[in-house]
Design a protein with these regions (language model features):
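Short alpha-helical segments that sit at the start of domains
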Residues: 469-482, 541-565
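A short, conserved structural fragment
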Residues: 516-526, 600-610
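Minor-groove-contacting beta-hairpin "wing" of winged helix-turn-helix DNA-binding domains
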Residues: 528-536, 611-619
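Short acidic, hydrophobic short linear motifs in intrinsically disordered regions
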Residues: 490-501, 575-584
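Short amphipathic alpha-helical elements of helix-turn-helix/winged-helix folds
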Residues: 482-490, 565-573
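Short amphipathic alpha-helical interaction segments
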Residues: 503-517, 586-601
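Membrane-embedded helix-loop-helix hairpins and adjacent transmembrane boundary segments
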Residues: 1-478, 495-500
C-alpha cells in the first residue's frame, strides 16, 4: 500500500487546484450561455485537448489494460481505444459543423426543433438517464480501483470524488470543466510516458511476456471480428459510434466551440491525438502488469495491480492523481450534459420559456447539484458496478443516435415516425438487455439501431402528410419581427438566431416555420447545413420597417449600426474590453459576444486566444471601416 501521507497530500493538492479553477472561472459566468457553453468561446486547440483527454477516462483506463490481457495488445489498441477515437473523428467530420450551426444546447432541443416536443421529451429522458449512467460508471470505476490502493472505503471514495467535481462545476460551469480537462492531461500524460519507459526497460521490452505470440505479435489476438456480441471488432465500432453520436456529452463539447471550424477541428484533432499519444500507452499497461505482477489476479485489476506493486511510491501516487483527474474531468463533462438537458429541455422549455440567460444561471447551478446527488446514489447502490452502468448507457443512447442522423440526412423523417421509432427502440433495447441474449447472441446496441431505424423509416413513409404541416402560430408578433430583423442583418444561421433571440430553440423554429409558411423566410435546403441556414424573402423584407440612412449603409455589408460601431472601435483603439465596447456601441455587455461572432463570421475580425477569445480587425474589416 502506498504511503498514506504522500497520497493524502498529493490528492488534496489536486483537489485544491480544481476547486481554485472553479472559483477563478466563476467570475466568467454572467449567463446560462456562459455556464453551459462558455459563451461559445472554446478554441480549436482547447477543444481538441478536452475531447482527446476523454481517452484517459477511468473507464477506458481500466478497460484497455484488461483487453490487452484477454484479447491482445493490438485488439485493445486498434479495436477498442482507437475505434472510439475514429468515432469521434467521424462525428466531427459529418455533423460537427452542423451542431455548431444549429445553436442548440442539446440533442433533444434540436429534435424538438426538427420534429416534435414529445420526441424531444423522450430523447431528453434518454440523455438524462444515459449521462447519469456514464457519470456513475466513471465514479464507480475509479472509486473501486482506489479501495485496494488507498485502503479507503468505496462509499467514501464516491462521496469525496463526486463532491469535488460538483463544487468546481457548480462554480465555473463548462469553463471550469474545460480547464480541468486540459489540466488533467498536463498532469497525467507525463506520468504515463515515464511509467511506460521505466517498465519497458525493466522487462527488457516485454521479452518474457506470457503468450507473446498472440498478445503482442498477432493483429487480431483472441478478438472475434464479426460477431454481434461484445467484445468483437464490429460491435465495438458500432457501440462507440452510438455512444458518440447519441450522447449529449459530445454534443455540448462541439456546440461550445467558438466557430464551426473549431467544432470540426476539435473533434478531428482530439481523436487523432488520442490515437497517437494516449491509446498505445494504455494498452501497454496491461501487458506490463501481466509480465511484472506475480500471482493470480483478475485482468480487470491490471491498472491497480501495476500501480500498487510495480511502481515507486512517487510514481504510484502520480498515477493515482492522473487517473483521479481524468475520472473527475470525464464525469464533470457528463454532468454538464445532464444539467444542460434538465435545464434546456425541461425547466426552460416548460416552466420558464421567456426567462433571460441571466435569470437561468442559479437554476442551472441547482440542476448541477441535483444531477450530482443522483450520480452518487447510482454509483453507490447500482448492482453490477461500472461495466453494467456503461451497458445501461448504451441502451439509452442508441435510439437518439439513429434519430439524430436521420434528421440531418433524411428529409422524409416525420414527427410520428421519430416518436414511434425512438419509443419502440428504447423498449426493445431495455427488454433485450434484461434477458441473457445480449451476452450470447447479439449485443443490445444492434437491437437499438435496427429496431429504431426500421420503425422510424416505415412509420415516416406512412405519415408523409406531416411534412407539410403548418405552424401553430396564427399571427405575427414581436418575436417574428425580431427574427426577420436578425435575418435582414445577416444573421442567417439557426445558431445566430438562437443566440440573438435568447429563447428556447424549439420556439424559434416554430416562428421560422410560420414565416416560411407565409413566404417571408426561406430555408436553403432540406439536409445537413442547408436546413439550418435561412434567408429573408422580398415579401419578408417588405414586412419590416424601412431602414434609416445609417442602417442602409451598414446593411450593404451585412452589418447593423451596432456592428459597425464595434468594428470601428476595435479598429481605432485595439481594445476588446466588453464594457468599453458596450459603451461605444450601445449594446448590452452580455450581448457583445453575438456581435463579435457575427463580425468574425463575415471575415471583418480575426479571432485568436487560447482560452478567451481575442480579436483584431482583418484587412477586409479595415476596408469596411474606411467605407463606413
Amino acid at each position: 500500500m502506498l504511503p498514506q501521507w504522500m497520497l493524502i497530500l498529493s490528492v488534496f493538492g489536486f483537489l485544491i487546484l480544481v476547486i481554485w479553477i472553479g472559483r477563478l472561472t466563476s467570475k466568467w459566468i454572467e449567463s446560462s450561455s456562459d455556464f453551459f457553453v462558455t459563451g461559445r468561446e472554446i478554441s480549436l486547440l482547447i477543444n481538441a485537448c478536452a475531447i482527446g483527454g476523454i481517452g484517459l477516462s477511468a473507464s477506458v483506463v481500466a478497460a484497455m489494460p484488461m483487453f490487452s490481457i484477454t484479447l491482445g495488445f493490438w485488439p485493445s489498441f486498434l479495436f477498442y481505444g482507437s475505434m472510439w477515437a475514429v468515432a469521434v473523428i467521424i462525428y466531427g467530420l459529418t455533423i460537427g459543423g452542423f451542431i455548431r450551426r444549429t445553436g442548440a444546447y442539446t440533442i433533444s432541443e434540436w429534435l424538438g426543433m426538427r420534429l416534435s416536443t414529445k420526441t424531444r421529451v423522450i430523447c431528453a429522458t434518454c440523455q438524462l438517464l444515459g449521462t447519469i449512467s456514464v457519470m456513475a460508471a466513471n465514479i464507480a470505476g475509479i472509486s473501486a480501483v482506489l479501495v485496494p490502493i488507498t485502503g479507503y472505503p468505496y462509499v467514501l471514495n464516491v462521496l469525496a470524488i463526486t463532491g469535488t467535481f460538483l463544487l468546481y462545476t457548480f462554480l465555473g460551469g463548462m469553463w471550469a470543466v474545460t480547464i480541468v480537462d486540459v489540466a488533467h492531461i498536463i498532469i497525467g500524460m507525463p506520468a504515463y510516458y515515464i511509467v511506460i519507459s521505466l517498465l519497458l526497460a525493466k522487462t527488457n521490452l516485454l521479452a518474457n511476456l506470457p503468450g507473446a505470440d498472440w498478445r503482442l505479435y498477432s493483429l487480431t489476438g483472441h478478438m472475434p471480428l464479426f460477431r454481434l456480441t461484445f467484445p468483437s471488432m464490429i460491435t465495438m465500432g458500432i457501440t462507440w459510434l452510438v455512444f458518440v453520436f447519441g450522447s449529449q456529452y459530445y454534443w455540448i463539447r462541439l456546440t461550445s466551440a467558438r466557430s464551426e471550424r473549431a467544432a470540426i477541428g476539435g473533434a478531428v484533432w482530439g481523436g487523432v491525438g488520442a490515437i497517437i499519444f494516449i491509446m498505445g500507452p494504455l494498452a501497454l499497461l496491461g501487458l506490463l502488469a501481466l509480465d511484472l505482477v506475480p500471482g493470480q489476479w483478475a485482468p480487470a485489476q491490471a491498472w491497480g495491480q501495476l500501480v500498487g506493486h510495480s511502481l515507486s511510491s512517487v510514481m504510484g501516487v502520480w498515477m493515482i492523481v492522473a487517473v483521479l483527474g481524468a475520472s473527475m474531468s470525464t464525469a464533470s463533462t457528463a454532468l454538464m450534459g445532464t444539467s444542460s438537458t434538465a435545464m434546456r429541455d425541461f425547466y426552460q422549455r416548460f416552466f420558464r420559456p421567456r426567462a433571460t440567460p441571466q435569470e437561468l444561471v442559479n437554476p442551472s447551478r441547482v440542476a448541477v447539484l441535483i444531477a450530482g446527488v443522483f450520480t452518487a446514489l447510482l454509483a453507490i447502490f447500482y448492482p453490477g458496478g461500472a461495466a453494467w452502468l456503461l451497458a445501461v448507457a448504451a441502451a439509452w443512447f442508441g435510439p437518439p443516435a439513429v434519430i439524430l442522423v436521420l434528421t440531418i440526412y433524411w428529409p422524409r423523417i416525420t414527427p410520428t415516425g421519430s416518436f414511434t421509432g425512438i419509443v419502440t427502440g428504447l423498449i426493445a433495447t431495455v427488454a433485450w438487455q434484461l434477458g441473457p441474449y445480449w451476452q450470447t447472441t447479439m449485443h443490445m446496441i444492434w437491437v437499438a439501431i435496427c429496431v429504431t431505424l426500421v420503425v422510424t423509416v416505415i412509420v415516416s413513409l406512412l405519415t408523409q402528410s406531416e411534412r407539410g404541416r403548418k405552424s401553430l402560430t396564427t399571427e405575427l408578433d414581436e418575436y417574428h419581427t425580431q427574427l426577420m430583423s436578425l435575418l435582414r442583418q445577416g444573421r442567417t444561421t439557426l445558431g445566430a438566431v438562437v443566440d440573438g433571440m435568447k429563447v428556447d430553440g424549439e420556439r424559434i423554429y416554430h416562428y421560422l416555420q410560420y414565416l416560411m409558411d407565409m413566404g417571408y423566410v426561406k430555408k436553403e435546403g432540406e439536409t445537413s447545413l442547408s436546413q439550418v441556414t435561412f434567408s429573408l424573402t422580398s415579401e419578408g423584407n417588405d414586412m419590416l420597417p424601412a431602414l434609416s440612412t445609417e442602417e442602409q449603409l451598414s446593411a450593404k455589408f451585412a452589418l447593423t449600426p451596432a456592428d459597425a460601431a464595434i468594428l470601428k472601435y476595435i479598429a481605432t483603439t485595439n481594445n476588446f474590453d466588453a464594457a468599453s465596447l458596450s459603451e461605444a456601441s450601445g449594446v448590452a455587455r452580455s450581448n457583445i459576444n453575438q456581435n463579435i461572432i457575427h463580425l468574425v463570421t463575415h471575415g471583418y475580425l480575426l479571432e485568436s486566444g487560447l482560452w478567451r477569445r481575442t480579436v483584431k480587425v482583418s484587412p477586409q474589416g479595415r476596408e469596411i471601416v474606411d467605407k463606413l
